Amino acid sequence: MKVAFAGTGYINKIHARAARNCGLELVAVVNHHAESMAQFAADFSIPRQYKTVEAMLADGNVDALVVSTPNYLHAPQTIAALEAGVHVMVEKPMSMNAAEAEQMCEAAEKSGSTLMVAHCWRFDPEVRWLKEHSGKLGKIIRTKGYGVHKHWGPSGWFTHSEFAGGGAMADMGIHALDTVRFLLDDPQPVSVYARIGTYYKGFDVDDTGLIIVNWENGVTSYIESGWWQPHSDGAEAATQLYGTQGFGQIFPTKLELPNATEEKIEIIN
């Protein structure tokens, strides 16, 4: 499979290493910053460089595209690739808003190509360990999730609504939301309460957020997001499951069962 990359930042470097380790052929990179694009191409022995996704698609010979660019580019770059018959993995958040996300899904359905959002935590070994063992907790009643940076936050386009669409909730809270959906077998929401605010920096996006979701299976999820927070009740990407027979969590990952013993995670190398 021939893979191209839109964006040359930290996350796409991880994706490129993973693709190379899987034996995929890295054929093209897209970025309007020539210097960083040239360095990315050199680091991963990528032969083709382009300023736009459209120019790359016009030359063809690409099977899949990894989109890891500022959020406002996710929808147009993804839709262009799907319409060209190219599979797409797009970084989170999927888009700037729900309308764009629906357009992306429609393009995937019409083209027959695969569209995937890169929600990475559901593939983490510790998350999968907790899902595998969550049956020991009985009926899950509620969950708590945290997508919080303490004493730190991003800069650049992340903090501008015209480029990012949202702030800490779209950047960090979305990890906690997708993780709990995975642990609960991807239920549909019945009701959602959400509140965001900006308190710590002069951004025009949120640096603090809260979501409460009532799911169709009767579980209630509480999710916090934040940048520059002075404190968090959980680790940066922690998720906690409260069941009738016990408690489980990731980061640190463990089960606490009714007999007061703890079953800690197996060592995963």
Question: Where are these predicted regions, by residue range?
Answer:
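N-terminal Rossmann-like dinucleotide-binding module
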Residues: 1-44
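Hydrophobic residues in well-ordered beta-strands that form the structural core
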Residues: 5, 50, 67, 90, ...
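Beta-loop-alpha module in the N-terminal Rossmann-like domain of NAD(P)-dependent dehydrogenases
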Residues: 15, 44-107
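Basic phosphate/pyrophosphate-binding loop/patch that engages nucleotide-derived ligands
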Residues: 106-114, 128-141, 242-243
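Predominantly a Rossmann-like dinucleotide-binding segment in NAD(P)-dependent oxidoreductases
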Residues: 121-203
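Contiguous beta-strand/loop segments that form the cofactor/metal-binding neighborhood of enzyme cores
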Residues: 178-254
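C-terminal helical cap and adjacent loop that interface with cofactors, partners, or active-site loops
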Residues: 249, 265-269
